[in-house]
Amino acid sequence: MRAIQSSAFKVLAVLIFIGVIAAGMISLQRSHVESSATAVENVYDYYNIIDSASVEKKSADELFSLYRKSGVTSLAVYDETPEKLVNHDYLRIYRGSEFAFRNPTAQGISDSKIYIQPVLNAEGNAYFKETKEYLSLLMSSDDVRSFDVNGVETLEVNAVYNKFMQMELGIYAETVKNAASHGFYVVLRPGNEAHVTKDYVDLFLKKLDASDRVSAVIFQGKEVLGYKEYVNYLSHELSRRHIPIALIEAQNQLGFEKQSGNLDMAVSSDYQVVRLYAMSKDELIKLDPKEAASRYYISDIERNIRMNLFPSFKFPLDGMTLSETNASYIADVSSRLEGHGFTVGKASVMESYFPPSILRSIAMAGALSLVVMTTLLLFPPLGRYVWVLEILGLAVTQGLFWGLHSLMVLQLLALGAAVCTPVVVVSLFLNYCLKRKDKAFAEIGWGKLFVESLLILWISGILSLAGAAFVSGLLGDIRFLLEMQIFRGVKLTFVLPLLLISIVYIQKFPFFGQTVSSDKDFIRFVKKFCGVQIRLGLLVGLGILAVVGYVFIGRSGNNGAPVPGFEIALRRFLENVMYARPREKEFLFGHPAVLLAMTALYRKWPQILHYFLIVAVTIGQGSMVETFAHMRSPYVLSFIRGLDGLAAGSLSMIAALIGVMILVRLTRFFGERYGKL
């Protein structure tokens, strides 16, 4: 109580307020960058459409029209292989014995060699020419020979037939032009070659220049094209052509798929990159089309994904052909995106945004003041050293920021703000509880209790959103928006606030008959706590806490515990009816606990119950702040998610009020019955 009333606390509050304004200004600038990049590119495999036409009794043009109407904007073109070139009737490739049989007059044919000829039309000749071009770079000159057979140019290749047929040659200009001719953008998917040469990289760029419809490059394999020596060169050439690199989001949604050189290339290109979501075929076959569409839609709106790479279902569904099945779920994604204010087209590339250093510096000072304020609440005797802590902290953090341009200091202060915000907010709530604890429930009544709890919830929520601005502002640059850098310490933001608010609580409310106000009191508290007799009821309670802890901690992050089906259904419902789905632990758990905590205070329920309800309130407020730690999520979406959580929590509070009223009446009824026995 004394800490909150001190002059130091008030000065720190002013410094925090100034820091919040600076962090808020950065967040608004960041929001403008995000809201200016709302075009999502839908990509599908070019050859998948070509190959499906014959087996579905459709022309290729009919299927291209089907996918165009579904919202597919771009066709993915991969490195050609000899096998694909034969399958699509561009080349003829023979084993030596077969070629000799077909050309008995030809001289010098070896059974161990491979022979390549074009299909005798303009397209075949073009593909043959490109194949010759690639083989001259990828194979030794001793292993490739060109000669005429009956007036047809022929390539003789010294290689093992089966391995050669699977050999990745490269991107073909003819394929790029063919894909673009159907009215789509083209996304190139090159792989790297061992000991890649500059000539090979230049040849790729030549193929890229074959069409002005190339919209992006998605590297495939474990390395980007040109790794290691020509990464910067290729990055520069792509930037010069204004062609972005697509980084594939990792399956666990943390960072990107492992690919040597991709992040270096992104930095070298001044962050001309887009985030791409790709679902594996193994994952897709486990889902129905509606759920698959929801996964893509949520990824786009919640994680700054601006390119979708769609796989094909394995089997057709609902009486449709396989192409119709695929087009159906892609159309669902496109429709929902457009309904949410996005456009479907060439992927937007975010501005390479870095906030003004002075604003960031002020936000850092505010976040530091928040940490110092929390220290003051936890350890009131340190109040005499508060300005020493503040000045020392400013010297260290500002020195690291301005002198070394340290990224770690930003991450540490963001973590500090995320941990300390719910602690300070709930400490203020506890201070209010202290002022009201002597009030009798008869003076309040259910109606006033609800209104009071509702006001407390919204005031607390607004303060938490203000504190969350520090996380958004301190980490608000393009590296974090693309998730090339991340918020560090997510698990700590769940656990530490609960431990810290417990320390604050035992200083304000009596456990075992007295509060903790000194070191001796704390030691006495620990001894009494360790001496508590363990009974069956306590074991049951600890079991319930263990389950809650598993759900709360285990379900956090991206690799959390599995989510049951009914909860997935609830999430999908909320996604459809609200702008941003609120978190269950906020509106079903933490926010209603405000009313229950006030009820426990006024009705003089056991102190331990009031404590656990305060912990629940802390979880709710902490979750609101932790939402902003996911920097890939747009700022506006995170902010509205918090407001939606408060709105849904207000409704849950009504349910909690009704439940408590029923419980009180039942308790009174059975208590009176028991008294008459």
Feature names for model-found ranges:
Residues 3, 8, 13, 22-23, ...:
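A sequence-composition feature that detects small, non-aromatic residues
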